[in-house]
Each structure stands twice: as structure tokens, then as C-alpha cells.
Amino acid sequence: MATVVIAGRANVGKSTLFNRLIGRRKAITEKIEGVTRDIIKGLVVYNETSFLLYDTCGVFESTRDPVLLAMRDKAFEAFRKADLILFVVDGRSGITSEDEYVAQQLRKIAKKVLMVINKSENMSVVEKNLPDIMKLGFAEYIPVSAQHGNNIDELLDKITNLLRESGEKSMLFKESSPKIAIVGKPNVGKSSLFNALLNMDRATVTPVPGTTRDPVDEMIEINGKKYILVDTAGMRRKSRIERKTIEQFSISRTIDTIQSADVVLLVIDATEGVTRQDKRIADLILSSGRAMVCVINKFDLVNVRKKDYEAALFTEMPFINFCRIVFTSAVKKSGLEKLFNAIDEAYESYCRKVPQQLLSKLASQLPLLSPALSRKNLRIYSIKQIKIKPPKFVIMVNKKELTDYQTEKTLQRFIRERVDQFTGTPLVIEFKSRR
């Protein structure tokens, strides 16, 4: 599939343009330089053609920040691999030395470049700046307003035409592969695990908590199976996050990623043990109706038996006792095969629909299995599975008012014990009164 990469200095509206082109808010957009750190990828579908669009960080000419240097290197690597580069400049404020630096680097790469003059709401201002813009040396250009959507269809027409001229194929594909989100507190090794799974340097890994701001996704194929892996920002306690900051927006994107994932890997630092924040994140994942695998990372740094650690973990978090626990060392790349096995198991459970006869049999056995339910004068007439992802069951009773949280937990337990374990996935129970 053809790849298009957005390039430019900081704060010219690259992420706003990215969000506009893919049709949803995926990259973080704020008026602060250096907001986008990781390379964000999205699929653009336009007039029955499609291409992969990449948003990169703002390119800084001179910086000593190790994170910005690492991201600049990643941006240049993306430019070299691109089929087409969208060089975004600010039509309102005009050209700066940073723009000239980016243009110089793009000319060295010698790729096809389309210059996108953003913030072009006022064309009289753009026309004043146009002579300086044209000195950057790129003949193909188009004025747009990413914020207001002006000229976006014309931009898409230009992109698809340029890709066709260069012989690049764009095509449609079905995103049927399971989406796996990697979440956890800052500095538990999420990005290291992400890179170990991909076996490539894709997300920026540094010892500074909070390096990954945007969700970063990548397709991976293992033993003929394809997965979409998503690395996310670390989630700290709300009380420690300043309002209206980049970190707050990053956490919001992480929550969105959890809610759009199929399986979530909750990464816990083995050297810290289970913390309150780990419990909060686990509860968020399961209450969002996502399948979950608990990953105990950095296990090579502790001297504890797996059996003992697992027992202690389930004591701290009994509400995840249906989830698989996998012990890993992202740095040493150990436990990764078992992790994929656990992902497969959780995803299969997440998508499973059980035979109706098993549910009918359970419904008939419940008065004997749980006399406590009968003592509440609650009668259960039928159990029916109506959905998957996650499995959802409608339970017909005489009076819905007689049910409570404990009734729900009891029914979930019996379904797991008598029908299917549903390892790794939460079960949704809905009670309905029989008319």
C-alpha cells in the first residue's frame, strides 16, 4: 500500500491536517511545540482508493534534547521510506529558518514532495508570503485550512493523482486483525515490550517516564496470524496530572485506544508489585468490556517464584482471576511466545459464541446449583447469548428488581464453570423481567 508522510517544522498544523485527512481525532493537537513525539499512522480512504498516512514530529534544526533528536531521526527515516511527502508550511506566519532547514533535508532525500500551505483562510496574506514559500524549491503546492477543512478534497485529489503518476498502488483492506493495546503506568516497560514484540525500533524508548504521548500502532504477523499492536502513553493517577496539559490529552487518547481495542495488555512492573493505579487501570479495561492479559514485565529483576507472584496478584486483584498472567522481560525478550498464546486465547474467548443448549442446561440446573437465588424468590427462566466482543447474555427472570450485583457475579461464575471458561474476557449480564 502507498505511504504518504507529513513533514514540517513544529506548530504548522501537521497533526490537525492528519486528523482531518483520516477523518477522526487520533493525533494530539495543541499550540505547544513538539506535541507529536511518535509517528502516528492512519488509513485514508478516498474515492475508492486508499493509502497509509503518517504524521511525524516537528523537525527542529538545532536541539540537544535526546528525545527530540531521536524523533527527528525517526522522522527522517519515515521521509526516506515514503512514496509521497506532504511538506506543510504556515501560510499565515510565513517562512522561517526551520522551514528552510526542512526543505533542505527533503531535497537531499529526493522524494516526490507536495507542499501544503496550511492556515490559508486569508488568501491575501498567503499571496504576500508566496514568493518566499516558492523559494523553498518545490513546484507542486496547494493552499488549505486543516482547521476549517478548506480545500481538503482538492488536496486528496492531488495526493491520489501524484501516487498514480508514480505508479504506486493504493488499495482497500479490511481491518479484521485483532487490535492489541499495551497500557500501564509510566515506565513499566510498555514501549520496550512493544519494540520487543515488533523486533524493531518503532516507538521511542528512553528512561524518561511519559516518552510515548500519542498511541503508536503497527501491524505484526506471527505464525501466519496478523495483529495490530498499539503502544500508549503511561497512565498516572488523576491527582498527579495537571489539567489542560499534553499529558491529560495523552491519557484521553489512551482511554480511547482501550475502548477501541480487542485485547488490552496490562503491563505491571514486577519490581514494584501491584499498586492502586494498576488496579484502577485493570478496572477501567474490564469495565470498558475489553479482553485482558496481565503482563508482569521486568520479571528477570526479581527473585520470586511465578506461582507465588501469581497467587499474590490474584489476592490483590481477585476481580481479574479469569485473566491469563504472563511473565516477561522485554529487554531480554523472554516470555513473548507465551504472551502471544495468551493474546490468542483471550481474543478467541472475546469472540466466542456458545451453543444455546449449554445455556439452557445451565438455566435448568441453577435452582440446585445456587439455592441462595431461590431463597430470594428469584426465578431464572432462560439464558441466551446475544452478542460477542465481549460475550453478552440476556437472562430472563420473574422480577428484575430481585437481582443485584451479587446475582450478576454468581451467574458469571456459573457460566465460566459450567459452560465455558471465557479466559481473558469479561462477561456482560443483562437481566430482563418476563412479561
From Swiss-Prot:
Q: Which residues bind GTP 2?
A: 184-191, 231-235, 297-300
* Keywords (A to Z) from UniProt: GTP-binding, Nucleotide-binding, Repeat, Ribosome biogenesis
**Boundaries of every EngA-type G domain copy:** 2-167, 178-351
SUPFAM superfamilies on file: P-loop containing nucleoside triphosphate hydrolases, Probable GTPase Der, C-terminal domain
Question: A GO molecular function for this record?
Answer: ribosome binding
Q: Name one GO biological process term.
A: ribosome biogenesis
Question: For GTP 1, which residues are the binding ones?
Answer: 8-15, 55-59, 118-121
Name one matching Pfam family.
Answer: MMR_HSR1
Q: Where is the KH-like domain?
A: 352-435
The superkingdom of the source organism is: Bacteria
**Record text on subunit structure and interactions:** Associates with the 50S ribosomal subunit.
HAMAP family cross-referenced by the UniProt entry = GTPase_Der
Instruction: Please explain the role this protein plays, according to its UniProt record.
Output: GTPase that plays an essential role in the late steps of ribosome biogenesis.
What protein family is recorded? Belongs to the TRAFAC class TrmE-Era-EngA-EngB-Septin-like GTPase superfamily. EngA (Der) GTPase family.
Q: What is this protein called?
A: GTPase Der
Source organism per UniProt: Pseudothermotoga lettingae (strain ATCC BAA-301 / DSM 14385 / NBRC 107922 / TMO)
Taxonomy of the source species: Bacteria, Thermotogati, Thermotogota, Thermotogae, Thermotogales
